[in-house]
């Protein structure tokens, strides 16, 4: 409504309900290997973020929150794309170094990254433009996930810290890249992003 996402629903059929449970290997479709998989995420602006098993219509929605790190980046982990063509993983690594983060990262594709950090599986999600940065993000790739993170205690913005503008059509034409993390860590992540892009001579990505 007026460029703001009011309701977000995401179904992640291959995401373990318990983060400590290993995901089955590709091609393994035995019933036993699929038990415990499938999570439904729901967020409503001003009302919080919730989760339930995707295959249990009677299960109540349980509230979720981002992991509380109290600004300690040494305990934080990245949640980033598997495919290098989707985000600049090398720049991610440099940002992690600037922030003093370790090298333990969670890698997955799709909007499941938003879902993952919203319940504390990871802490920082960056989607940094590759190449000349001409690619424009599609709104459907970020709408539900951005609200989910916001309602779980996080902040989602572009690389320069601007809110994502969903009111300009099919793409986020007023934004470059995505930064999502806990609200009390967001300003520091934005500073690290700017520093890393400056080192690479790509500071132009901070303007649209």
Indicate residue ranges for each PLM-predicted region.
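Glycine-rich active-site/cofactor-binding loop and its immediate structural neighborhood
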Residues: 1-7
